[in-house]
């Protein structure tokens, strides 16, 4: 089963080192929620996820369900799954409100909940929520530090760089303090994840990019174990050209958001995306899509038969990922998402 077994090790010492770091932690297989359909209909889906071998579910928060409600339902419905947010923006909840939500989830699912915090993007934070997208590194760092204090039951009175808290103490003290993960793209945030949190959450990268990212986290951790949770976009379909053409829309939408554009440049993919960026900035969306190569699609989107997809996901795990949090993309309209979910677990 993919969540507990992996393909052969890396090709060079660097990747072997990353695989060695990952091997100290259980390899886990997760699915992104919410699942298709209304939230009240997900109970049987969640049971089936656990039945076929998934260990985790990870929520997202953008324009659909909030990041906590699907997990709260899962906490009551399916006790076999670990529950995580990937991610909650550090900007869109005030500190005390954030601490209450985190503590409540940890109380509802003792020992099974992980909180993932990140900067999100200027689109979600500023354009959709009306909050200035300023000092993202400091904002995430401050929220992580505040949550660590608050979740330990301490009375927090402190001037952080990006907010202040005066006399707050949580009224809910979870039996188990939840791990805190940091969503990270480039070096500064990756170092924060390694130094001050329990792990990093990464996305929009290929399997071959993982060692570059994971090494920074582990170096910053100074020898302590850190999880690397990767959201991996997957479409198990062998209708290759249909998937590739549809994937280009998703890639263009994300890679023109400044934080993701800079991430791809840092990974070394800038030259491959220059044509797309130039066409997009010039207002020619059709040319921008055409400029995205099949190689870029194949690096960022896992697709092919279920066996091929499982092999590609295994490469992420071999290269340093500890939890593969799959996100099913219905890029092929013929895709049966429930069957795809089963097939990706090897069921």
Locate each region found by the language model:
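Active-site-adjacent structural elements that line small-molecule/cofactor binding pockets in enzymes
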Residues: 2-347
